């Protein structure tokens, strides 16, 4: 993912499940500013969201539900229960994805 993102700096990339190993995944993408960490899929381990925000900034963390793999409650609890500011939770739970999709939505007439 990192190599692909470096070859295409104009693009934005979402690292689903943060690469499968969240601690390693967050650290690997840390210096690649056009890669975002999606925090679905893993067990609701304490500290996951806090680490992602600390290492990447809330602007590069995106919520994912992992529907079918985990319960909705366990996945959303990783963000809602995290020890981060409410403003960071708002970005993670929708603001960041909305910002990333805005150009595409606007081009298709779904946003102004």
What is each model feature region?
Residues 1-62, 109-112:
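Catalytic pocket-lining loop regions of alpha/beta-barrel enzymes
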Residues 17, 37, 52, 66, ...:
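Conserved, mostly hydrophobic/aromatic
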Residues 41-45, 63-68, 89-93:
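Short, surface-exposed, polar/charged, turn-prone segments marking secondary-structure boundaries
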Residues 58-60, 71-112:
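Mid-to-C-terminal alpha-helical segments outside catalytic/metal-binding sites
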């Amino acid at each position: 993912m990192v190599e692909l993102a470096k070859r295409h700096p104009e693009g934005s990339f979402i690292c689903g499940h943060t690469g499968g190993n969240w601690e390693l995944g967050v650290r690997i993408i840390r210096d690649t500013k056009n890669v975002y960490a999606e925090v679905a899929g893993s067990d609701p381990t304490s500290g996951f969201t806090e680490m992602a925000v600390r290492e990447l900034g809330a602007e590069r963390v995106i919520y994912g539900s992992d529907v079918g793999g985990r319960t909705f409650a366990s996945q959303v609890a990783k963000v809602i229960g995290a020890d981060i500011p409410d403003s960071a939770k708002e970005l993670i739970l929708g603001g960041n994805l909305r910002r990333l999709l805005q150009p595409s939505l606007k081009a298709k007439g779904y946003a102004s």
